[in-house]
């Protein structure tokens, strides 16, 4: 039965934490259609399909998340030459989902609306599968502030464009604000894993989540621009002073929803450019491809390390 009451809004931070839903209406439903996943509780046995899941990694594109499942499969010794990973969400072109062992890999598209839809259905999937002790990590790309391209940022706090650690949504015409808490212990574990790998620079910092790639992030090269270069530089410098080290478009709702539903969550993104020095991503494709593999390698190593201690 779904969690209800005022206390349900506060996710506990301990090691034995079931996935919870903050919606009493779910308990009244005879069938739940996860439309964007092409899965339904009447046709699919969620505990049999997903009950062993302990780690979920989400990222923007289907191809990147398929590459990740291959990466983690190899790291865990579960991959073999020629093995294919079928898309569990075949039949819909909205999201892609792959699984190997206790690891689920899901694409979420770009921006808050797209990842929000995915998270609603993903969290319900984990709930119906009776999963517990689930760690969920967003891996992706971002624009850095004051960092060399290729630097990996582990998010300490997801902040909005006013540098506040909260996610605001309009629900039935009213403002609803949720905290964007991330698991501090998980941040330190990931940072230690990066030090053990010793392959690339990794820092901990705040991540600013915006509603747009162009004006929302202070770019000067969009179809619209209502500010000067001086305005842009002043804003980015203020962000840096507030502890922001990278910018993307998903972390705030990701942190808010995962925290509320009892999921240990982290965000690990590589920076593709230093926004204090420009707006356009101009590195060669092969360089960008290697950058994008860095969060995958770090998180794969982390998962292997955690499973070896289980």
From Swiss-Prot:
Annotated binding of phosphate, by residue: 60, 94, 138-141
Catalysis performed (reactions): uridine + phosphate = alpha-D-ribose 1-phosphate + uracil; 2'-deoxyuridine + phosphate = 2-deoxy-alpha-D-ribose 1-phosphate + uracil
Keywords: Glycosyltransferase, Transferase
Pfam family, one: PNP_UDP_1
GO MF entry, a single one: deoxyuridine phosphorylase activity
Coiled coil: none
GO BP annotations listed: cellular response to glucose starvation; CMP catabolic process; dCMP catabolic process; dTMP catabolic process; dUMP catabolic process; nucleobase-containing compound metabolic process; UMP catabolic process; UMP salvage
EC number: 2.4.2.3
Pathway: Pyrimidine metabolism; UMP biosynthesis via salvage pathway; uracil from uridine (phosphorylase route): step 1/1
InterPro entries documented for this protein: Nucleoside_phosphorylase_CS, Nucleoside_phosphorylase_d, Nucleoside_phosphorylase_sf, Uridine_phosphorylase_euk
Family matches, as SUPFAM superfamilies: Purine and uridine phosphorylases (SSF53167)
One term under GO cellular component: nucleoplasm
Family according to the record: Belongs to the PNP/UDP phosphorylase family.
NCBIfam families listed in its UniProt record: euk_UDPppase (TIGR01719)
Function: Catalyzes the reversible phosphorylytic cleavage of uridine to uracil and ribose-1-phosphate which can then be utilized as carbon and energy sources or in the rescue of pyrimidine bases for nucleotide synthesis. Shows broad substrate specificity and can also accept deoxyuridine and other analogous compounds.
Subunit organization: Homodimer.
Name under which the protein is recorded: Uridine phosphorylase 1
Gene that produces this protein: UPP1
